[in-house]
Curated annotation (Swiss-Prot):
Gene behind the chain: thiC1
Enzyme's top EC category: lyase
Protein name (Swiss-Prot/TrEMBL): Phosphomethylpyrimidine synthase 1
InterPro entries reported in the protein's UniProt record: ThiC/Bza_core_dom, ThiC/BzaA/B
EC number: 4.1.99.17
NCBIfam families per UniProt: PRK13352.1 (NF009895), thiC (TIGR00190)
Function summary: Catalyzes the synthesis of the hydroxymethylpyrimidine phosphate (HMP-P) moiety of thiamine from aminoimidazole ribotide (AIR) in a radical S-adenosyl-L-methionine (SAM)-dependent reaction.
Disulfide bonds: none
Lineage: Archaea, Thermoproteota, Thermoprotei, Sulfolobales, Sulfolobaceae
One Pfam family recorded for the sequence: ThiC_Rad_SAM
Amino acid sequence: MAIIEEARSGQITDEMKEISKLEGIPVEKVRNRISECKIILIRNAKYPSKKLVPIGKGLTTKVNINIGTSDEVVNLQMELEKVKVANRWGDTLMDLSTGGDLDDIRREIIRASELPVGTVPVYQVFIESFKKKSGGAYFTEDELLSTVEKHLKDGVAFMTIHAGITKELAIRALKSNRIIPIVSRGGDMIAGWMIHNNSENPYRKHWGYLLEMFKEYDAVISLGDALRPGATGDAHDEFQVGELLETARLVKSALKEGVQVMVEGPGHVPLNEIAWDVKLMKKLTGGVPYYVLGPLPIDVGAPYDHIASAIGAAISSAAGADLLCYLTPAEHLGLPTVKQVEEGAIAYRIAAHAGDVVKLGRRVRKWDDEVSYYRGKLEWDNMISRLIDPQRAYQVYTQFGIPKVKACTMCGGYCPMMWAMDQVRKIGSSSSL
């Protein structure tokens, strides 16, 4: 039985109990929110990952790590090193490979990952069509559906399914004065297929069958945003919002069938529009989990888009976004290295926690309070061991050698905390104060 159906029947399962313990919320609240798809469990029930990853209302914000080859750079060993980074810093992992033996790469990544793995199945069918038929848009509807099924059988836990874009929306977007008509790779593949074949979106045509497949594996449909804004000047235009309205209808039909679903979001969004972007999506979809790419509040940040987008990600998390898709320093410029993947992952781990301090309050802020307490006491071992990256923190703390005094090498003997502790002792021992 699918987890939504278990929840709707009143069952309290071991997974629900584990989510309750992991997140610190009552198990009945977990069950109720799963029944409404306000909490989902990112997993393939037939091939569960090592890490249990619940996403949704009242839970800590999770971080997704994208990796994968390109047709320019095919290096499986490098991608497997990225998996190690994801295992340390991430909650979910997506294989976005477009170069090499895609079946072999996907299976190797799934084997190496401790996290639930997601894919974008249209990539594979489009690329194989391009190689075999000299055109990416020549794949058949059966080939697309077979590829989705193959990914599920391999243990994929969630997939980006670009079902919200219609042929009419695609044509209008391509003819529009948008700064960039379509920036979603998978979305553009679906748009190209619809135009080439003069046919409606194959995902929409076979939506019922897709729901059956995902329900069998109790995997998650991640409804892709093919018309997400790729420039801040395109944010919340008629095409982004039009697709979101279509997506909201698909969400309702998925929930009716007991299929776990989440919605993907932008993209490039000005800072002042990020919070209400989250609220708009939640309102239209009934509060299902929101999986956001950033968003990036500026378009000029590369090669620092991991920093720029982390600002947007923190705001979206605070406003209620549930899963953050990270960006790396290589975003908009090229395939990321292992180091760049780590830099992006850390930036998003920080953004997620910053958002959670607002969204969840005391439940998560006690971590910050502990660190601050030990910092105020100059108890370096206790403080550093609780930081987001203790190893790196210790390297910085000792980069000029062990400090000569109890303070760090920035303030040295003039450390305000050191002086304050001394002043407290003097006040305590003085009868005149």
